[in-house]
Amino acid sequence: MALQMFVTYSPWNCLLLLVALECSEASSDLNESANSTAQYASNAWFAAASSEPEEGISVFELDYDYVQIPYEVTLWILLASLAKIGFHLYHRLPGLMPESCLLILVGALVGGIIFGTDHKSPPVMDSSIYFLYLLPPIVLEGGYFMPTRPFFENIGSILWWAVLGALINALGIGLSLYLICQVKAFGLGDVNLLQNLLFGSLISAVDPVAVLAVFEEARVNEQLYMMIFGEALLNDGITVVLYNMLIAFTKMHKFEDIETVDILAGCARFIVVGLGGVLFGIVFGFISAFITRFTQNISAIEPLIVFMFSYLSYLAAETLYLSGILAITACAVTMKKYVEENVSQTSYTTIKYFMKMLSSVSETLIFIFMGVSTVGKNHEWNWAFICFTLAFCQIWRAISVFALFYISNQFRTFPFSIKDQCIIFYSGVRGAGSFSLAFLLPLSLFPRKKMFVTATLVVIYFTVFIQGITVGPLVRYLDVKKTNKKESINEELHIRLMDHLKAGIEDVCGHWSHYQVRDKFKKFDHRYLRKILIRKNLPKSSIVSLYKKLEMKQAIEMVETGILSSTAFSIPHQAQRIQGIKRLSPEDVESIRDILTSNMYQVRQRTLSYNKYNLKPQTSEKQAKEILIRRQNTLRESMRKGHSLPWGKPAGTKNIRYLSYPYGNPQSAGRDTRAAGFSDDDSSDPGSPSITFSACSRIGSLQKQEAQEIIPMKSLHRGRKAFSFGYQRNTSQEEYLGGVRRVALRPKPLFHAVDEEGESGGESEGKASLVEVRSRWTADHGHGRDHHRSHSPLLQKK
C-alpha cells in the first residue's frame, strides 16, 4: 500500500523537487550579483576618493553666483549716485539737460558693457518687482510732498485735464495706430485693435519730472506748475487702471468675443477702482495719524508707522483689485497734515529724507534698466509703426491740451493763456512708467512685444532728450508769466486773513466757491478731526497756528544755515566787522565777564538719560526752540506794552513826543501795586539778573530812568567818544569792545507815541505812570549820563 502511494505521487514529488532546486540556484545568483555590485561600488568610491585632491580649510573662496543680483544692483545704484554727484558739481549742466538724461546714459553705458562681455544682467524688472517694490516709493514721495493749498485750489482743472486728457490720448493714439496697421504694406496686420489700445494707454503715461525741475529753476507761475504737477501725480494711477482693464479685455478676447455689456462693466470698474483706491487711502491715512498721537515716548518708530501704513494701503487696495497708486497717494495727502503735528522734529526729518531716498533709488533703477535694455538684440524695428507712434503722440497731445483748456477757461477766474497751453503741450515727456508697462506686456498675448518696447524707447528718448532739453529755452523765449518772490510771513498771514474775509463775503452774498468749501472743512477739521488725531492742543485760530509754523520753520533755517532770514520778523543785518582788533586789558576782560555773567542765559543743569526707543534731540532743534521762545516772548511783551495811550482815552494825532519806555495804567492803583511787587523769581540760577517792576511818576523818575538805561561801556572804550543810545536801542544795541563788535544782551525797550495833551490836561485825574525795567548792573552807571541827557533827541519835544 505504501509502495503504491509512493509510485502514484512520485511525479508530483519530482516537480516539487525541481522547483526547490531552481529557487535555491536563483537566490545564490542574486546574492552573487549583489555582492559583485557592492564590491564594484566600493571599488569605484575608493577610486574616486583616491583621484580627488584632499579637501581642507581654504583661506580664500569665490562664490559670485550667490551674491550676483544684490551685488550688481548695488553697483548700479552707486554708479548712478556718483554720476549725480558729478552732474551737479558743474552748476551749468543741470540747466542744460534733465537728470533723467544722465541716468539713461549711465544705463546705456552699463548695457554696452554687459552686451560686450556677453554677461546676463540680473532680473531687476518683472511685474511683481515693479508694481510691489519700485512704483510705491515714487508715488508716495509725490503725494507726501504735494503742495496741498494750490493743488486743491485747482483740483477741478487738474482732474479735468488729468483724467480726460489721459483717456483722449490713449483712445486717440490706439485708434490711429490701428488704422495704420490696416495698411498691408507696413506688415502690421497681426496687431489687432485691443493691442493698439493697450499700447496707446501705456504710451500716454507722461512723466514730466524733468520738466518740473526746469519749471522750478525758471520760476514759472503757480497755476501752470500745479497743472503739470497734478498731471504727473494722477496720470500714473489713471494709466495703470486703464492698462489693467485692457489687459483683462485682451485675455477675454482670446477665448470669446467682447460684448457691449463687457464694455459698460469695464467703464464702471474704472470708476470703482479709482474711487475705491482713494477711500482706502483716506482711511489708512487717518489710522496712521491716530496711532502717531501716542508715540511721544517711543519716537524711534514714528517713521516706521508712516511708511508701513502707506505701503499697507497700497497692498490692501491691490488685494481687492483697486488702484493702489491712488490709495497710497490719498494716504500720503491725508496723513501729512496730522502726522507732522504729532511726530518729533527728528522723526519728521527722517521721514522726509528717507522718502526722498527711496524714490530716487526706484527711479534710478528704472532708468538704468531702461538704458540697459536699449543695448541688445531684443528689438524689432518697424519704421512705419515707430514713426507714426511718435507723430500721433504729439498730435493727440496738442488736441487734448487746446480742446480741454479752451473749455476749462470758460469757468476759470484766471484762464490759461496760449503760452501756458504751449508749455503744457511741450511738457508731455514720457519716462519710467511707459517703459515699465511696455516691458511687462505678456508675450503670450502680444507676439509683437519687442516692437512695442522698441517704439516706447524711441518715444522716451525723443521726449526726454529733445523736449526735456529745449523746454527751458522755450519758456524763456515765450516769456511765460513768472511767479512772485517767496512770500514773507507777513504776506502769508494776510493771505490767510483774506481767505476768511472772502469766505464771509461769499456767505453773506449766497455765493458758493472754494473759499467757502475750504472754510467749512477747516471748521469741521478743528471741531472733530484735530481733537481725535492730534496730540497737543494747538491755538484755535488758524492764523496763529500758521504763524507758529512759519516761525518755527524760519528759526530752524536760521540755525541750520547760519544766515539770518530776510522775512518781515527777522533781525536786521548787522554791520561789518572791524578789521583792526586790539588787545584788551585785564580790567576790560573782567568788566566784560561781569556783564556777560549778569546778562547771558544761564545753562540749565540737566540729568543725562538714555532711552533705546527715543532719539536724542539735536542741538539745532534745541536752538530753534530757544529762538522761537525768545521771539515769542519779545513779541508778547511788545504787544503788552504797545498800548501807549491812557486807558479809556481816544487816540490823538497832535503834539506827539517819543519816550524810551511805554506808559502803564495810571488809573489802577491796584495794578500799580501788583507791578511794584512783581519780581522774576522763576530762574533758579544765582547768576541770573533779578528784574523788578515798579510804578512811579513819569516826570519824577526821568533822571533815574536815564541813569538805568546807560550801560557802563565808557570804561571799556578808553580813548573813544561816549556812545549814544538813540534809535539803535530799538533794534539791536552794539558795543565795540576793543575793536570787536558785541551785541548787548539786555531787554529791548521800544519807543511808543504819547499824547502830550493827555499829559498836560490830565494832572487832576492822575499822572501817567511808567512801568520801567530796573536791571541791576555790577559796574558804575555814572559815566556818560550828562552827555546822554544833553544829546538824546528822544527826550525833547517835537
UniProtKB/Swiss-Prot annotation:
A Pfam short name: Na_H_Exchanger
Protein modification: May be phosphorylated.
Location relative to the cell: Basolateral cell membrane; Apical cell membrane; Zymogen granule membrane
Protein's recorded name: Sodium/hydrogen exchanger 4
Source species, domain of life: Eukaryota
Homology family: Belongs to the monovalent cation:proton antiporter 1 (CPA1) transporter (TC 2.A.36) family.
Extracellular side: 116-127, 176-196, 248-270, 326-356, 406-420, 442-450
Chain ranges passing through the membrane: 95-115, 128-148, 155-175, 197-217, 227-247, 271-291, 305-325, 357-373, 385-405, 451-471
Cytoplasmic membrane side: 1-13, 29-69, 91-94, 149-154, 218-226, 292-304, 374-384, 472-798
Coiled coil (residue ranges): none
Annotated InterPro entries: Cation/H_exchanger_CPA1 (IPR018422), Cation/H_exchanger_TM (IPR006153), NaH_exchanger (IPR004709), NHE-2/4 (IPR001953), NHE_CaM-bd (IPR032103)
Quaternary structure note: Homodimer; each protomer has one site for sodium and one site for proton binding. Interacts with CHP1 and CHP2.
Intramembrane residue stretches from the record: 14-28, 70-90, 421-441
Biological processes, Gene Ontology terms: gastric acid secretion; glandular epithelial cell development; monoatomic ion transport; potassium ion transmembrane transport; regulation of intracellular pH; sodium ion import across plasma membrane; transepithelial ammonium transport
Predominant localisation class: membrane
Substrates-to-products reaction catalysed: Na(+)(in) + H(+)(out) = Na(+)(out) + H(+)(in); Na(+)(out) + NH4(+)(in) = Na(+)(in) + NH4(+)(out)
